[in-house]
Amino acid sequence: MNRFARFAASALALSLVPAMLMGCGKKETAASSDLDYIKQKGTLVVGITDFAPMDYQDADGSWIGFDADLAKAFAESLGVEVQFQTIEWDNKVMELDGKTIDVVWNGMTLTDEVTSSMACSNAYCNNAQVVILPADKAADYGTVDSLSGLRFAVESGSAGMAQAEEKGLMYTDVVDQATALLEVKSGTADAAIIDSLMAGAMVGEGTNYADLAIGPVLNAETGEQYGVGFRKGSDAAAALNEFFRQQWESGALQALAEQYGVQAALIEQK
């Protein structure tokens, strides 16, 4: 190699040093935790379904509800924007792990399956699974034992579906609980199994489903509780628990619950 070639090679090697150092610098600024990842990208992507009074759209198409409003406030506390993404409930863990969403915040029952596959917040609302029937037939089905032979609509992958299986009831799974109600209203299904919180807001006199009624509670003995789910191992769940505690202490959580009619189900945050 002549002197000029050696000089050119040396110059090229030196020119690569800053680029290599810059590459190392980028690795150092990578998110060190899930919470940092959310903050660095500047958005909290919330996985939801149409589920009043927790998550639903107003006349302008904006997402509102007890959970939706809490998610907005939590995102604001982190200094990020909130983005709502509708999901298929059966795919919630896959959506989290694939980072298409950051959190499932949608009146989610804290089952063993959920708590083993997600980093979950403390429980914040009590709930139960109830049967929804046409109002003119509700009196005929006052007990769980009387339900055999009915065709149920249930949300796929939901606690309602689990209750249908546990009780040996015939069912068809649908995309969400709102669709389950529509199936009963249209006569496609004899009954539905949905969350008691949704039933209280959506069914009966003064609602869009005045011709439907709430029937037996399927898990009255055990009940269930709602929690919020992040990716497995995420530190964002601990941050949300602290946010819940602060919101309880300030009274903001109780006021929001009263706004959406879920105050009786609210669990104290310590």
Where are these predicted regions, by residue range?
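Extended ligand-binding regions for polar small-molecule ligands
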Residues: G25-K27, A68-S77, S158, G223-A264
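Flexible hinge/capping segments at coil-to-helix
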Residues: L35-Y37, L133-R151
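Short helix-initiation/N-cap motifs at beta->coil->alpha
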Residues: S32, F84-E95, A139, G157-S158, ...
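Periplasmic-binding protein-like
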Residues: N126-L133, S196, G200, G204-R245, ...
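Extracytoplasmic small-molecule ligand-binding "clamshell" domains
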Residues: T29-G107
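C-terminal motif of bacterial Sec signal peptides marking the signal peptidase cleavage site
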Residues: A19-G23
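Beta->alpha turn/N-cap motifs
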Residues: G47-A52, Q85-D90, K99, V103-T111, ...
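Short loop->beta-strand "edge-of-pocket" segments that line small-molecule binding or catalytic clefts
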Residues: T43-I48, T143-G157
